[in-house]
């Protein structure tokens, strides 16, 4: 998130912002997938369940924020420096790319965005990028495994005879693996809560 200008990426042209945002997303991809592409296994790389989820989250987040800003902030667009649909899309695209990869750059002050948009940004901060990337956060792989693990446990509760099998990237995961993921996410949110509590006590 470091830069040499005070207004971050807002200082640069629209073209530069698109290029930077795109490369932020690319660096949020698991580097092992790039290796598969380099050795000619492109189909195997693009079959990645985590990659599809990662890109889907980005696309959905961008369009929800775009629609939310347009529908709820029409009267405030000029004060935000957003004059047309292209700018709204660009700012949404860049902020989502920057937040989900835990980069820290920004092209606009999203403090003035609607509550839904800010909520999405907060969720993206916690999620982070793919495992094996430069991004931080919980990681998309853990998110997918946790949801599948929850679904498997629900089916087990409904039908005790059901043989629980949690699959990820075409492989059956051991129960200890899903338990480790649940433990990590629980610890992550617990520490986040503790840090927020400490900060709220120290702020005046």
Regions inferred by a protein language model and the residue ranges of each:
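Membrane-proximal intracellular helices of multi-pass ion channels
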Residues: 2-204
């Amino acid at each position: 998130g470091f830069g040499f200008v005070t207004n971050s990426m807002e200082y640069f042209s629209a073209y530069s912002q698109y290029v930077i945002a795109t490369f932020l997303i690319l660096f949020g991809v698991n580097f092992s997938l790039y290796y598969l592409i380099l050795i000619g296994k492109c189909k195997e790389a693009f079959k990645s369940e985590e990659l599809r989820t990662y890109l889907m989250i980005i696309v959905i987040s961008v369009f929800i924020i775009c629609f939310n800003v347009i529908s709820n902030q029409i009267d405030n667009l000029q004060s935000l420096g957003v004059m047309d649909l292209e700018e709204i899309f660009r700012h949404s695209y860049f902020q989502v790319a920057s937040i989900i990869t835990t980069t820290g750059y920004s092209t606009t002050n999203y403090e003035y965005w609607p509550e839904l948009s800010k909520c999405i940004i907060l969720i993206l901060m916690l999620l982070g990028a793919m495992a094996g990337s430069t991004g931080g956060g919980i990681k998309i792989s853990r998110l997918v495994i946790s949801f599948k693990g929850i679904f498997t446990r629900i089916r087990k509760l409904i039908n005790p005879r059901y043989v629980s099998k949690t699959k990820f990237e075409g492989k059956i995961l051991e129960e200890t693996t899903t338990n480790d993921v649940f433990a990590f996410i629980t610890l992550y949110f617990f520490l986040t809560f503790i840090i927020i509590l400490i900060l709220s006590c120290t702020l005046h």
